């Protein structure tokens, strides 16, 4: 009787790794060993990327807010300090969206920030 090198359980497990490597270049999408190595590496990059995405978006919002308050003679840090003094608790994402889509409402926040800074 011939020796069974791997059965259906092993085949299914290997097939799962190959399926995850769909679309990869070269032997990385067909060879089990290469596919497994690449998928593990890809998952590590994806994990890191999910953390970086949060940083990148925060940076983007800060740049947008800074660009929006400069015409009013304020810097980003002074503007945020003024909002804090005025007890206005709006997150950076919303401030960025307001600056782009609704400049007149954003101007009201800038005025409130200025007022809080001058009355300090």
From Swiss-Prot:
The keyword Nucleotidyltransferase is assigned to this record: no
Family annotation (Pfam families): Ribosomal_L20 (PF00453)
Alphabetically ordered keywords of this record: Ribonucleoprotein, Ribosomal protein, RNA-binding, rRNA-binding
GO annotation, cellular component aspect: ribonucleoprotein complex; ribosome
Alphabetical list of CDD domains matching this protein: Ribosomal_L20
InterPro entries the record matches: Ribosomal_bL20, RIBOSOMAL_L20_CS, Ribosomal_protein_bL20_C
UniProt record similarity statement: Belongs to the bacterial ribosomal protein bL20 family.
Gene that encodes it: rplT
GO MF terms, alphabetically ordered: rRNA binding; structural constituent of ribosome
Function as written in the Swiss-Prot or TrEMBL entry: Binds directly to 23S ribosomal RNA and is necessary for the in vitro assembly process of the 50S ribosomal subunit. It is not involved in the protein synthesizing functions of that subunit.
GO terms of biological process kind: ribosomal large subunit assembly; translation
Lineage of origin: Bacteria, Bacillati, Mycoplasmatota, Mollicutes, Entomoplasmatales
Protein name per its UniProtKB record: Large ribosomal subunit protein bL20
Aminoacyl-tRNA synthetase keyword on record: no
